[in-house]
């Protein structure tokens, strides 16, 4: 694993430190300031030739990013999470320790410097070293940079290298953290209670998706990694909670692309005595809050598209298919005509698809990618909404919406089905679809139906994909760019590939 010549050279230097009585993985030394705090505290220091106040001694830590040796002195760029700070190390102060430093120190090593502030002749605030310690000897040379597409997979597989080399990547994940904490704060301010529900389910449910299956040895039964927390959260509404939310992982055993990862983060929230129309207004307030928190304008650029949050609109499913998708009502209303139309357009359609699923195929193909500004699409076909409340005026549609931004689904919400008999029939229909070969159809969950039978108040519920939300608000083009360790196909690692030194 460590046979590479450059790695061997570094291992030799680590052993050489041990021979000098120095631990190359020293512990217990503390910094007094972050690099950013040092730069802020001593910003007034400008004069190299003026008196140096060695009493103002600080300790800083970080990774060596640049090393310039110049005889009896050297300049070192040291980076911690907050900033890069230059250190000046001279043989005059360190004596024999300076010789050891020159012999052993390399780019990538993690160090501690204790010293006083001063400014170079160019006016750069630096730390003048009085002590220097290697805290962690890096034995694998770091890459200087990544070279575009050829290294994208390496960035995802070895995210730690990506974070070391590309500061902008770290910024994305800091912004992700801010987005998640802001979403949490928003719902707390709205009066919602954060809860946690099981990650392993006896029956997969809450969404149309294929589950991951595992096995519980003690109980001797199969368990399913959750595809959605929905049915457990609605059990809490039955139990008397009136506004709950959960931010956590879901797992779906399906394909991967630039907007899908099998392990992803969602927020789901449920609100008793409210309707899906209330959720639409709540969603608008949420985005207003996020844009203000992140100091973003109401117009943002994503994938070369201008998204204007001031142009938020609401449109029904069929109207969107007609006015945006360009399909006439005559075709949309007849199952046989719609099937023929899709086939004429070269769309491969699975046999025995229901009218509602044919409409969904048409929507995915002709409408979704055109929804650039925030668009709430309402009145979904009941056949593709097995957990949503049936509309009072039209039993063929559900009181449901999905939010699309920049051509992608961001949220899904609806007034919840709380009629246990209707829910039982919907589950039976889903089971029939599964028996016909639909792997994504939902399972029968009699325990959930039994919970509904105890009475669930009128409730509205919604899910928002956090990863896609972060993509939108950071401009990331792939979901892998906003997940620290995305799912990747396993490869045999060659840890001895020659590195540029």
Curated annotation (Swiss-Prot):
Belongs to the class-II aminoacyl-tRNA synthetase family. NCBIfam families: lysS_bact, PRK00484.1. Signal peptide: none annotated. Pfam families: tRNA-synt_2, tRNA_anti-codon. This is Lysine--tRNA ligase. InterPro entries: Aa-tRNA-synt_II (IPR004364), aa-tRNA-synth_II (IPR006195), aa-tRNA-synth_II/BPL/LPL (IPR045864), Lys-tRNA-ligase_II (IPR002313), Lys-tRNA-ligase_II_N (IPR044136), Lys-tRNA-synth_II_C (IPR018149), NA-bd_OB-fold (IPR012340), NA-bd_OB_tRNA (IPR004365). Mg(2+) 2 binds at residue 409. It catalyses: tRNA(Lys) + L-lysine + ATP = L-lysyl-tRNA(Lys) + AMP + diphosphate. Homodimer. GO terms for cellular component: cytosol. GO terms for molecular function: ATP binding; lysine-tRNA ligase activity; magnesium ion binding; tRNA binding. GO terms for biological process: lysyl-tRNA aminoacylation. It is found in: Cytoplasm. Its cofactor is Mg(2+). Mg(2+) 1 binds at residues 402, 409. Keywords: Aminoacyl-tRNA synthetase, ATP-binding, Cytoplasm, Ligase, Magnesium, Metal-binding, Nucleotide-binding, Protein biosynthesis. Gene3D superfamilies: Bira Bifunctional Protein, Domain 2, Nucleic acid-binding proteins. Binds 3 Mg(2+) ions per subunit. Its EC number is 6.1.1.6.
